């Protein structure tokens, strides 16, 4: 077995993210082998198709096996992409919102680590045996921003991590999180997409998929009717304005300091957050893998004796 491989995983409500991949959190279980091996995880004698749709809301992601199975799929994807051995020792780096970090750290680490024994499974028809030798947990959002040191020169800056279900807020003072400023708002992109879907259904009688709506938000031309596209962007603009108002109401003055927006929602809302002239100074980090990259970077710093995050 080779040296320990560090793999960062961002366990989102809507999507799982690693340094090189992002895939939906949907998980469909089958008793028998599906017709295709694409995105199929075989574990414990059962088959799971990974990435079909999204998970129902789980406020505690450790209450079911779903996110553990999604973690195995994420590890397999990274090992294959990196050309690493499929029998590997893993240092898993993950994150939690700062608002619940102290409360949930122990249970999350136990959930991912288990007993540290070898885990045999198959992914997309290939055999894997991984041993999770260590789990390190870090504050999400903060870990992502640390990858962008040039953005941290301001004495105070707001960080808004727009996820699927929540928007996690914090203020950094001289690069250090101000714990009293941390908030978690249930205003994530799932709500935005659902509101858009309902408005399109009401005006046009159409049931659009999440994939269609997200494609339009990214600016894809496609073959969509321009009237529908206009409604999508109008609703997204309303959502962005409401989000900025909620940030201000939570005690973070977006008129007084820069605001860094990151996460999957920031990538989708880039044009709308950038268009809020006079409301804030937005800095958009649209790389959805920034948290995962930040986790791996922090593990590297730990190994050199800089900081800690267990």
Model-flagged regions — what are they?
Residues 167-173, 181-182:
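Short, acidic (Asp/Glu-rich) active-site segment that either coordinates a divalent metal cofactor
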């Amino acid at each position: 077995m080779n040296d320990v491989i560090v793999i960062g995983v961002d366990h989102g409500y809507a999507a799982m993210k690693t340094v090189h991949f992002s895939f939906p959190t949907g998980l469909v279980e089958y008793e028998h082998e599906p017709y295709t091996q694409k995105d199929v995880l075989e574990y414990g004698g059962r088959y799971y198709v990974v990435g079909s749709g999204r998970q129902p809301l789980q406020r505690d992601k450790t209450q079911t096996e779903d996110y553990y199975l999604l973690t195995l799929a994420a590890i397999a994807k990274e090992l294959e992409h990196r050309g690493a051995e499929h029998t590997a020792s893993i240092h898993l780096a993950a994150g939690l919102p700062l608002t619940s970090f102290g409360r949930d750290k122990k249970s999350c680490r136990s959930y991912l680590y288990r007993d540290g024994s070898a885990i045999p499974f198959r992914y997309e028809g290939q055999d894997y045996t991984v041993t999770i030798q260590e789990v390190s947990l870090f504050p999400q959002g903060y870990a992502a921003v640390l990858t962008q040191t040039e953005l941290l020169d301001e004495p105070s800056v707001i960080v808004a991590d727009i996820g699927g279900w929540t928007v996690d807020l914090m203020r950094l003072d001289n690069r250090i999180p101000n714990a009293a400023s941390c908030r978690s708002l249930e205003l994530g992109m799932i709500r935005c997409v659902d509101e858009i879907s309902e408005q399109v259904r009401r005006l046009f009688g159409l049931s659009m998929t999440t994939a269609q709506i997200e494609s339009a938000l990214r600016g894809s031309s496609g073959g969509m009717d321009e009237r529908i596209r206009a409604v999508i962007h109008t609703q997204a603009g309303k959502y962005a304005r409401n989000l900025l108002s909620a940030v201000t109401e939570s005690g973070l003055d977006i008129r007084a300091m820069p605001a860094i927006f990151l996460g999957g929602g920031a990538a989708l809302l880039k044009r709308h957050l950038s268009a809020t002239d006079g409301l804030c100074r937005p800095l958009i980090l649209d790389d959805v893998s920034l948290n995962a990259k930040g986790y791996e970077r922090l593990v590297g710093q730990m190994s050199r004796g800089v900081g800690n995050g267990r």
